[in-house]
């Protein structure tokens, strides 16, 4: 991960599941995925990414990084990675896992969860988040048992009155 200024040309949209706003739903996880084709090898490729509240990003199944720095009530942060070592000529996949714990705190960013990313080769954007990304709420995190967090009571519990 590196710190720098955003690319000159910004593309993409903040995306999330259309049926989920993230408000009031605790422990919502989202998998986002986009396939793309690379015609030739590249010496350097930037992946810019941000998410509220957090993300793990993978390229072709390899974990590239996680972040961003914790958002404040007025700002969220972005990161960039050189993903050229992870790219292959032909078919490639970028995958993002994010989770909205929806923990109510005084410092929590007051906006719904969302993801944004953009891939540049050279100075040219070649891939960005938009409505064509495949997004799902995975069932693999629904273990049928109560989950808890150090700062909260049980979030899903048969013991709740």
Language-model features: locations:
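Short, solvent-exposed loop/edge segments of extracellular or virion-exposed proteins
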Residues: 14-21
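Accessory beta-strand-rich segments of carbohydrate-active enzymes
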Residues: 1-7, 21-22, 27, 32-161
């Amino acid at each position: 991960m590196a710190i720098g200024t955003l690319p000159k040309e910004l593309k993409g949209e903040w995306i999330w599941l259309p049926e989920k706003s993230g408000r009031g739903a605790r422990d919502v996880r989202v998998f986002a995925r986009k396939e793309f084709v690379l015609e030739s090898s590249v010496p350097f490729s930037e992946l810019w990414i941000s998410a509220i509240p957090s993300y793990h990003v993978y390229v072709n199944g390899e974990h590239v990084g996680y972040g961003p720095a914790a958002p404040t009530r007025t700002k969220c942060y972005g990161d960039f990675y050189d993903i050229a070592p992870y790219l292959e000529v032909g078919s490639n996949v970028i995958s993002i896992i994010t989770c909205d714990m929806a923990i109510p705190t005084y410092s929590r960013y007051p906006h719904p969860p969302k993801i944004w990313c953009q891939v540049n080769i050279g100075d040219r954007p070649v891939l960005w988040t938009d409505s064509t990304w495949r997004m799902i709420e995975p069932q693999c995190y629904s273990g049928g048992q109560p989950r808890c967090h150090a700062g909260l009571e049980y979030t899903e519990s048969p013991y709740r009155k």
